[in-house]
């Protein structure tokens, strides 16, 4: 979906399923790609969106969102986004759900936001479960809970950096009002791979609750025998906070 394109309802639900192609020469075979487009469920409508990246190419995310005003949102219903990264062989950079510069997943009113992603099955690096990266990249709510769960690609045997959830380069995950923010991540990788964090908050990335809600983070490092397979890591001004709740 490019800039200016939209899918919307006035009071109904939106259900979208997308699957990338499987040609061995294909790259960026995202299951669902939103580049400046918008998906909006009005009234009490909900959004359920699922994407699976192509099984052969590299850089094939399950769900890929980028470029303002790209967004998936509701007026008050729940928003659920799930994705499975594609790839095979030496494929890399196949995230389950990638929310990149200028893109947002949100819910209005008391609607909850659920995002779940599983990194691709290639043996390369950067097969994140959920990636929130870049200025304006945001997963948020107006008053409901925000729940993000990511599983890094488990077949990464050559290099590491298959994080469960990465919040990077000023990307943000946050709930407002009474909503709690819960982030759960499982690092991927096998053999001697390293730097497969469960949850990594890096380069001014932020996980927060701006109201009275709590922040709950659970991270499990990858299974490789290399270094830095930590559960939860903050680096380079990464930020975790709650304005009125516990962390």
Where are these regions (language model features)?
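Surface-exposed loop/turn motifs in large extracellular/passenger domains
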Residues: 1-247
């Amino acid at each position: 979906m490019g800039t200016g394109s939209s899918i919307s309802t006035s009071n109904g639900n939106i259900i979208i399923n997308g699957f990338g192609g499987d040609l061995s020469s294909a790259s960026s075979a995202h299951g669902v790609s939103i580049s400046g487009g918008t998906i909006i469920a009005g009234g009490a409508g909900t959004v359920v969106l699922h994407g699976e990246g192509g099984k052969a190419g590299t850089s094939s995310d399950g769900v890929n969102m980028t470029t303002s005003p790209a967004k998936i949102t509701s007026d008050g219903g729940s928003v659920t986004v799930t994705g499975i990264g594609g790839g095979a062989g030496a494929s890399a950079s196949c995230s389950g759900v990638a929310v990149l510069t200028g893109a947002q997943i949100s819910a209005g009113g008391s609607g909850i936001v659920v995002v779940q992603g599983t990194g691709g099955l290639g043996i390369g690096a950067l097969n994140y479960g959920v990636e929130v990266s870049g200025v304006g990249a945001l997963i948020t709510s107006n008053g409901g809970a925000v729940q993000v769960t990511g599983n890094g690609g488990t077949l990464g045997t050559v290099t590491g950096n298959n994080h469960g959830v990465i919040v990077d380069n000023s990307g943000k995950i946050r709930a407002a009002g009474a909503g709690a923010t819960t982030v759960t991540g499982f690092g991927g990788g096998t053999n001697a791979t390293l730097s497969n964090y469960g949850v990594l908050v890096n380069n001014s990335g932020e996980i927060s609750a701006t109201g009275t809600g709590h922040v709950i983070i659970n991270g499990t490092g990858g299974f490789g025998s290399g270094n830095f397979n930590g559960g939860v890591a903050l680096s380079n001004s990464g930020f975790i906070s709650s304005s009125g709740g516990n962390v």
